């Protein structure tokens, strides 16, 4: 048992160190860049050390617990703790944020504020994944919005203000329902209001109230995850944001919704989840098909990748709705797998459009000749995204398939039907991704821009791409790397649904 406050340090370090950026000497951007990257690296090494030496995989209970009184009059505590569900997400956050900071190297305008906002997001994300108090969870959920809004509205494309406003309206609207749910949970039933997750797990509610609470939380997660029809902020946001912001959005922000769905709706409201799970599976199946076919009609290649993200989130929703050991592990695997693949596709799309100043597919063609390295990596990650065997996307989708098929909750015919719909979605994925590759990279049409200024990706970009490619291949070949983290915790969670 470690009594050292590891998690508090992990949560506070980025935002505290980030606030010191403004006091660094004004000697160009170099100092600020190196300072930010070293903070991200230090944080990532600290979390890796803490999890390697102080976290027991076999123990399904909460570990590295911390509990400090914060606001005494409200009985509000700073409670942190991690288990198998959150370890993977925290490591993903550290990994992607460090590489996104490296990807943001070319940002020179207001670079101090930019890097500070990235570090503030880092703190909020780790705080969310490790919080053990519902109000703290909500605060971290909200803390995320301000940096993302500023990153979008200050460093984006031509329609950045429109997309940033749309993002904040959607997410703030979802958060109102979240807050009502949090207050409803805290004030129900006991004389002492308290939001400790340990206490709330054992709390039972009247069926109507539980369904209302579940629905309130679900709306908030449906915006973040996103679940159709609340997904329309995502393509606009990804189409306009700077690619390092896109990496954080696709890699981590979307996963917060999935994490909340497992952590709060599944754990704290099991009866409502049992009732709603068939609907979740149906929505997930519709989402896979709908987003894949919408993606096919997008002219802007960034928006095409954004819709592919929405489609892949459908697998996570189905895994969570299947209420099986295999399905839920598959959903967690897909959370991490898409975190790597989605972030990289946006990074590649951003670096390519920065070089060409074009985003519409009909204006492109033949880019593979001046940019062979970008072409190779783009093709490789597109293959990972369309679930090529040997890469992480394939394993994740396969495990979710098995989870749905083995679910005792559904009858055979609905299972067959939903599996068929998922299979159609998996056929549409290669169609829209490969047609995008063909339009961008193949052919002889080299556009009106003088081709002399085309540079292929440099060592910094290749380093980022190879760093992400290794875990994608690693998880694809040996999925137990990730599954071993969550498998005991998932079993403990599902014992509420199927008592032995």
Curated annotation (Swiss-Prot):
KW Chloroplast (keyword) present: yes
Membrane topology: Multi-pass membrane protein
EC class of the enzyme, as a word: translocase
A molecular-function term among this protein's GO annotations: ubiquinone binding
Catalytic activity line of the entry: a plastoquinone + NADH + (n+1) H(+)(in) = a plastoquinol + NAD(+) + n H(+)(out); a plastoquinone + NADPH + (n+1) H(+)(in) = a plastoquinol + NADP(+) + n H(+)(out)
Compartments, record wording: Plastid, Chloroplast thylakoid membrane
Protein name, per record: NAD(P)H-quinone oxidoreductase chain 4, chloroplastic
Gene that specifies this protein: ndhD
């Amino acid at each position: 048992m470690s009594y050292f406050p590891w998690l508090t340090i992990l949560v506070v370090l980025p935002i505290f160190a980030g606030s010191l950026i403004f006091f660094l000497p004004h000697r160009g951007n170099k100092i600020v860049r190196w300072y930010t990257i070293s903070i991200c690296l230090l944080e990532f090494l600290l979390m890796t050390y803490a999890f390697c030496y102080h976290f027991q995989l076999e123990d399904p209970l909460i570990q590295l617990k911390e509990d400090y009184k914060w606001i005494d009059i409200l009985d509000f505590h700073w409670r942190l703790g991690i288990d198998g569900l959150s370890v993977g997400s925290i490591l993903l956050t550290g990994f992607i944020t460090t590489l996104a900071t490296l990807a943001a190297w070319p940002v020179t305008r207001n670079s101090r504020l930019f890097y500070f906002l990235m570090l503030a997001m880092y703190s909020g994300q780790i705080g969310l994944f490790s919080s053990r108090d519902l109000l703290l969870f909500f605060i971290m959920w909200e803390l995320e919005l301000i940096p993302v809004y500023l990153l979008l509205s200050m460093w984006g494309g031509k329609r950045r203000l429109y997309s940033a406003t749309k993002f904040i309206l959607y997410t703030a609207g979802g958060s109102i329902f979240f807050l009502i749910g949090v207050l409803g949970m805290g004030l129900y039933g006991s004389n002492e209001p308290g939001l400790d997750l340990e206490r709330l797990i054992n709390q039972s509610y009247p069926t109507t109230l539980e369904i209302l609470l579940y629905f309130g939380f679900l709306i908030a997660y449906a915006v973040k995850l996103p679940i159709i029809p609340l997904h329309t902020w995502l393509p606009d946001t990804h189409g306009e944001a700077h690619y390092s912001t896109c990496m954080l959005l696709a890699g981590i922000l979307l996963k917060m919704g999935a994490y909340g769905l497992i952590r709060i709706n599944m754990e704290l409201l099991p009866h409502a989840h049992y009732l709603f799970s068939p609907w979740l599976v149906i929505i997930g199946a519709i989402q896979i098909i709908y987003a894949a076919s919408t993606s096919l009609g997008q002219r802007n290649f960034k928006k095409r990748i954004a819709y592919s993200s929405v489609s892949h989130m459908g697998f996570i929703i189905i895994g969570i709705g299947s209420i099986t050991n295999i399905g839920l592990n598959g959903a967690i695997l897909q959370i991490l797998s898409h975190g790597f693949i989605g972030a990289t596709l946006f990074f590649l799309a951003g670096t390519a459009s920065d070089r060409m100043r074009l985003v519409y597919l009909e204006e492109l063609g033949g880019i593979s000749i001046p940019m062979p390295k970008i072409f190779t990596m783009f093709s490789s990650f597109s293959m990972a995204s369309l679930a090529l065997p040997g890469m992480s996307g394939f394993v994740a989708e396969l495990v979710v398939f098995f989870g749905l098929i083995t679910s005792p909750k559904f009858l055979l015919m609905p299972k067959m039907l939903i599996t068929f719909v998922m299979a159609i979605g998996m056929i549409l994925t290669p169609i829209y991704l490969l047609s995008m590759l063909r339009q961008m990279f193949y052919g002889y049409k080299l556009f009106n821009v003088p081709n002399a200024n085309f540079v292929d990706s440099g060592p910094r970009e290749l380093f980022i791409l190879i760093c992400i490619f290794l875990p994608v291949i690693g998880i694809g070949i040996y999925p137990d790397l990730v599954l071993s983290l969550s498998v005991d915790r998932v079993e403990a969670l599902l014992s509420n649904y199927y008592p032995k």
